Amino acid sequence: MNIGIMSMQRIINYGSFLQAYGLKKTIQNMGHTVTFVDYRVGKPLVSESISSNQKFESKFKRMMKVFFSPPYRMNRKQSIDSSKAFSNFCHTFQNEWLPILGVTDERVYSPKLDVLVIGSDEVFNCTQSNLDVGYSPQLFGYENSAEKLITYAASFGSTTIEKLDKYGKTTEISNLLKEFDAISVRDKNSHDIIKTLTAIYPIDSIDPVLLYCLLYTSPSPRDS
């Protein structure tokens, strides 16, 4: 079958890469073709808060700190060094890691599929301020072109029923979730939210990184 995975495959961190890789390899080892599917990044429901001190600190005041405060200069240097290190990591991720997943610069939206798997990772964590994710109905199956729609080890992360109510998304997400053919989650919070919004008891699954290790890696001699 032609199976798509919609996950956090473009988010630049180790965990997102490993879970995407683990799920892709597990499905491929079952004899299927796998394509990563992109979601459209929307505006976050939550605005990232900036402290008033940081927001209104004048340029002149920051310059005075640089000139007269050794601790500030040290912290500033560490911040610049960290920024350079992260920039190098992003370059490596884009040019070496994403090709391992088969992910290119070209975005893939709503392809024709036999099955679309949404997950794993915090694909349902919609009340966060991350601009790389935002609020995206596609992560809840909206506008998909697959014959079957399922999740694997999906998570709401820090999102709760109370937060969905606060931002007026409870009904919309409930209706979208009811269109899934099967739902599995990886944590109790996500299990409870699915049960509350859909009256469906989702399957509790392990993270695909752990699944891949259990299925396809041999124990070391010390574990024998």
Across the structure, where does each feature detected by a protein language model lie?
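Single conserved hydrophobic/aromatic residue that forms the stacking wall/gate
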Residues: 216-224
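Short, charged, surface-exposed secondary-structure boundary motifs
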Residues: 161-162, 212-215
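A short beta-strand/loop micro-motif in the catalytic core of glycosyltransferases
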Residues: 180-186
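Alpha-helix N-cap/helix-start capping motif
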Residues: 21, 187-188
